[in-house]
From Swiss-Prot:
Designated gene of the protein: FAX6
Miscellaneous comment as given in the Swiss-Prot or TrEMBL entry: For all TMEM14 proteins, 4 hydrophobic alpha-helical domains are predicted. However, NMR structure determination of the human TMEM14A showed that only 3 of these helices are membrane-spaning while the amphiphilic N-terminal helix is probably located at the lipid micelle-water interface.
Chief place of localization: membrane
Keywords: Membrane, Transmembrane, Transmembrane helix
Job description of the protein: May be involved in free fatty acids export.
Signal peptide: none
Name assigned to this protein: Protein FATTY ACID EXPORT 6
Subcellular location: Membrane
Transmembrane spans: 27-47, 57-77, 84-104
Family in the record: Belongs to the TMEM14 family.
GO cellular component: cytoplasm; endomembrane system; membrane; nucleus
Length: 119
């Protein structure tokens, strides 16, 4: 599976979560954090997709995706440990941990694989 197939929906999920946090609690921090990280992930996913279309891998996109997911895992994991609340901290920490593992796997295996050219 290609990284951008998960990265773009992951970014949209973070934006949506930040928006919901803002609407329910009036939290500008939730909105800014969700929108900021979500938009960066969508941008990284888009860069990766465009590189894939050229049969290349984007190291910058892979590193950016990994760093953001790892940072969210740490920040939201700490928040979960302090509050014990599954929503949103535990959920975001869990999803981000899975995404971090996925990105590390993609980096370790050489990035996106390209389909063989049919003759």
């Amino acid at each position: 599976m290609h990284d951008f197939c998960f990265t773009i929906p992951y970014g949209m999920l973070l934006i949506g979560g930040g928006f919901i946090g803002y609407m329910k609690k009036g939290s500008i921090t939730s909105f800014a954090g969700g929108a900021g990280t979500g938009l960066l992930l969508i941008l990284a996913g888009y860069i990766s997709l465009k590189a894939f279309e050229k049969k290349k891998n984007s190291t910058i996109a892979m590193v950016l995706q990994t760093v953001i997911a790892a940072a969210l895992t740490l920040v939201m994991g700490q928040r979960y440990l302090l509050t014990g609340k599954i929503m949103p901290a535990g959920l975001v920490a869990g999803i981000s941990a899975l995404m971090t593992c996925f990105y590390v796997y993609k980096i370790a295996t050489g990035g996106n694989k390209f389909p063989a050219k049919a003759e």
